[in-house]
Curated annotation (Swiss-Prot):
UniProt subunit comment: Part of the 50S ribosomal subunit.
Described purpose of this protein according to its UniProt entry: Binds to the 23S rRNA.
Biased composition (Gly residues): 29-38
Provenance organism: Pyrococcus furiosus (strain ATCC 43587 / DSM 3638 / JCM 8422 / Vc1)
Protein name: Large ribosomal subunit protein uL15
Length: 147
């Protein structure tokens, strides 16, 4: 059996170590700059790459409102009011007055939305109503009161 030592190719004495000309194995200069250099407005050396792979790299995108200006609108659906009317009565949010049930939504929400349907006439007090919610409240024989 022939035992031959494995030849290890470490390129000793090679001037360029497989990179061709010496200049080709230099830093970012041979690549058009390091990283995203050349993708900007002025030096468009990598412009075709930018357009294909990073089209959103340039330009303005949106605006963030300051947190102190932002206000979360708490919403409630008609479905919730109709299903939980007994609980709202016990909590004192809804009460009966002159044969009508009045629900004061302002204690836990800002706006009433129109998902679901009302099974009985209610007078609902809120800061805002969606058009669909107002329509459904009136169709059930109730009243939408802006506070």
């Amino acid at each position: 059996m022939i035992r031959r030592r494995k030849k290890v190719r470490k390129l000793r004495g090679s001037h360029t170590h497989g990179w061709g000309c010496k200049k080709k194995h230099r830093g970012g200069g041979s690549k058009g700059g390091r990283g995203m250099a050349g993708t900007g407005k002025r030096n468009k050396s990598k412009w075709t790459w930018t357009i294909k792979y990073a089209p959103d790299h340039l330009g303005k995108r949106g605006f963030s409102r300051p947190p102190e200006v932002q206000r979360e609108v708490r919403v409630v659906n008609l479905k919730f009011i109709d299903e939980h009317l007994d609980e709202l009565m016990q909590m004192g949010i809804a009460y009966e007055e002159g044969g009508k049930i009045i629900v004061d939504v302002t204690q836990f929400a800002d706006k009433v939305l129109g998902t679901g349907k009302l099974t009985r006439p209610l007078v609902i007090k809120a800061r805002a109503f969606s058009p669909k919610a107002e329509e459904k409240i009136k169709a059930a024989g109730g009243e939408a009161v802006l506070v």
